[in-house]
Amino acid sequence: MIIIVKIKRGLIVSCQALENEPLHSSFIMSKMALAAKIGGAIGIRANGVNDISQIKLEVDLPIIGIIKKNYNNCDVFITPTMKEIDELCNEGVDIIALDATFRNRPDGVLLDDFFENIKKKYPKQCLMADISSLDEAINADKLGFDFIGTTLYGYTKNTNGLNIADNDFNFLRTLLNSNLKSTLIVEGKIDTPLKAQKCFEMGVDLVVVGGAITRPAEITKKFVEKINQIKK
């Protein structure tokens, strides 16, 4: 698939800011994407058609598009229904990422059926599975997702508090040894250059970094917390 070759090996920067964050602005996210490109990023992950359309005016990098939408207290919120798929396809994104965990979807549709429905309607659209476990990765691989991302590892009830770097990246090592046909993308809690480097050394070709690059409030907070640990 052409898109896989186009974004082969490198850093993808997630440029997102939610409504309650100071940098919530499609214009600001587009400039963040431009800065990421200048810094050497080979792709962008973005949330919402407004941000995506603005980012496309600034950079010509491949875009992983998502729409975060909460439905009736459902845990699944990353591109959860066909409505969000339609919006992203109409906007035009290289890859659509969606929650591919085993959790209940807001419309009651099973992941297998959801994937099949997407492929029937948009057969050429590249899809990325955001997973939180080995079993979910294997299932996504069998379904035929183009990419599998560790995005939700540490962010579900069963994995809460876990970190991709735990036990010398044991979860990542397990995925790499599972003979997945889909291209593996490491995403989630890669908050230092050394962690990203480690992923590539282990054999990963694509790593997504978000908050460590694009959320200055969080970055500032980490500095302040370390400073405040020093007793006067």
From Swiss-Prot:
Top-rank taxon, per record: Bacteria
Gene Ontology terms, MF aspect: N-acylglucosamine-6-phosphate 2-epimerase activity
Transmembrane segments: none
Record-stated family: Belongs to the NanE family.
Single biological process term from Gene Ontology: N-acetylmannosamine catabolic process
Organism the protein comes from: Borreliella burgdorferi (strain ATCC 35210 / DSM 4680 / CIP 102532 / B31)
Gene3D superfamilies to which the protein is assigned, alphabetical: Aldolase class I
UniProt enzyme class: isomerase
Keyword Lipid metabolism assigned: no
This protein's UniProt keywords: Carbohydrate metabolism, Isomerase
CDD domains reported in the protein's UniProt record: NanE (cd04729)
Pathway the protein acts in: Amino-sugar metabolism; N-acetylneuraminate degradation; D-fructose 6-phosphate from N-acetylneuraminate: step 3/5
Keyword Cell membrane: no
Protein's name according to its UniProt entry: Putative N-acetylmannosamine-6-phosphate 2-epimerase
Pfam families: NanE
GO CC field: cytosol
EC number: 5.1.3.9
Gene transcribed to yield this protein: nanE
Function noted in UniProt: Converts N-acetylmannosamine-6-phosphate (ManNAc-6-P) to N-acetylglucosamine-6-phosphate (GlcNAc-6-P).
Record's catalysed reaction(s): an N-acyl-D-glucosamine 6-phosphate = an N-acyl-D-mannosamine 6-phosphate
